């Protein structure tokens, strides 16, 4: 989902309605798990009811159909690559067996260099370098009680550094998954 544009549409004339629909997918674990929820719902609708229904469903939920379609195409290419190299792919979106913690641990294993903790001053700081960071206003975590530890996928430089695509983590996961860090 990080390889495609933002999946959410927020037309200015229907901002409140769009925000309400988007909240159906949001979880306090962060943006990446929220994106996963959107994609799994899309994939389920596509498989169960077809492309035309899925287009309508995306429209009523203020989601970008073409962006989700592109993400699905990328998943198909990834599956083909796995198969070509002899790896089996277990389709888990039908009955998501992996827990949110399992998925977040996977995220930590890839994004551990982007770990940050909440400093007592109320500002996040990077584990390496102690650089001050803030949550981007588009993050679902922006309006929630700040999590103690997070990883982020992207930084945006404005007058301050803003974290985007954030996932809440447990600090013990860093010790296990990235002890070298």
Regions found by a protein language model. Name each.
Residues 1-181:
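Second RecA-like catalytic domain
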